[in-house]
Amino acid sequence: MRVMFAASEATPFSKSGGLGDVIGSLPFYLKKLGVDVSVILPKYQEIPQDLKMKMKWIKSMTVPVGWRNQFCGIEILSYKDIHFYFVDNQYYFNREGFYGHNDDGERFAFFSRSVLEILPHIDCKPDIIHCHDWQTAMISYLLKTQYQHHGFYKNIKTVFTIHNLKYQGVFPQEVLGDLFNGSQQHFNEGGVEYHGNVNYMKGGLNFSDYITTVSPTYAQEIQDPFFGEGLEGVLSRKKKQLQGVTNGIDDSVYNPQTDIHLFKNFSSENLRNKKDNKLGLQERLNLAVDAKIPMIGMVTRLVEQKGLDLVANQLEKLMEEEIQLVVLGTGDHQYEEIFRQAAIKYPERISTNLFFDEVLAQQIYGGSDFFLMPSLFEPCGLGQLIALRYGTVPIVRETGGLKDTIQYYDEVSKEGNGFTFTNYNAHDMFNTIKEAIRLYPDKRKFNKVVRNAMNTKVGWEESAKTYLKLYRSLG
């Protein structure tokens, strides 16, 4: 079984969010199952220089983008025994930032076409091309409408994974012809048309052989108008070819016993060292140094989706409780300002860090007692999985992957790995936080839920097996 992942980012080469983590870890677990897996990515300016230096040039060619022919360089790097191919074009990818450019539609039209064009030149005919999010969704459209009648491409199948339905890649109608040389017969409900525009993600949904998303609950939710972002009709029609597969994390990377960024390593059998991580974090962030104060961590984008409205609404009430709050992330100005002002008002109890720092993120996962994710919606979520691994008890709203991975702790049965609330409601969130911190002073009870969290399987092993079964079903 030969599978090629086509994506817009993957750690350690490029990462803006959870997609990069997934593409940087899942292929290695598939390889352990015997899959011949490779990955193809854009060669961004921001790829670390030491990795660029290890890339080997294969060849250069031209790729049609509508009526134009654009330069395409092909490079390869073998990383942990997996071939990573890179599509090089200085005009499209030698700039700051992976996304957010006015010509993103053209940039990823070029990348999608390049993926298909270069396959015969790299001696790689995959059984399946696994595409991810809107940036590579149109590979499925191109394959089905323009390539599949050619012998080389005849039996290639595509799987398309939705990581976040909110971001769809919607561009003017003209791009179908101008960038893809596509036929107007595909500009309809069963094709790529979306309110008079071209929707790349819709192309992925309608032309892929199978669709997955990143948790079973999210797969159900997106068939409903509230979560469907205007594509619920397509997803409902395709529900027999739609499956939710819960994301995992690379538990060899996220490992509190070996993580070099922690103040002190620890395990579920040695929780005393976890306290030292909290004390070290308090010192680093100039918070009151006190092991007895419950600390709540948030590593998040500061946007509405992540439930920041609920937190902002309850900040003053939360400060009436004996807690500390540590926030790391960037996002909308209004939320940044709310947390900036809160940290000024409560300097020993709130730490606001409006940037991203991988070391500090790991120290928050390792040092906090609780990890708050009150999301409005959450396709899967990786933060709660990392928190579980580090024994930082999640407090989450029951949506998407949060509902699938976090079970409310029952003091009687002693089962459960976190605390949850159902409704998107600030008071429900506050009451759940109060219930969680009520348990904190009783170390025997609290350490039980911590150990439950740390013993939760959060790696890729089971999900990789599910993907392999899915690939095989496509023949």
UniProtKB/Swiss-Prot annotation:
Residues that, per the record, bind ADP-alpha-D-glucose: K15
Protein name: Glycogen synthase
Keyword Methyltransferase part of the UniProt annotation: no
Signal peptide positions on this chain: none
Reaction catalysis annotation: [(1->4)-alpha-D-glucosyl](n) + ADP-alpha-D-glucose = [(1->4)-alpha-D-glucosyl](n+1) + ADP + H(+)
Keywords: Glycogen biosynthesis, Glycosyltransferase, Transferase
GO biological process: glycogen biosynthetic process
Stated family: Belongs to the glycosyltransferase 1 family. Bacterial/plant glycogen synthase subfamily.
Function according to Swiss-Prot or TrEMBL: Synthesizes alpha-1,4-glucan chains using ADP-glucose.
The keyword Glycosyltransferase is annotated on this UniProt entry: yes
UniProt xrefs under InterPro entries: Glyco_trans_1, GS/SS, Starch_synth_cat_dom
Pathway(s) served: Glycan biosynthesis; glycogen biosynthesis
EC number, UniProt record: 2.4.1.21
Any Pfam family: Glycos_transf_1
Entry GO MF terms: alpha-1,4-glucan glucosyltransferase (ADP-glucose donor) activity; alpha-1,4-glucan glucosyltransferase (UDP-glucose donor) activity
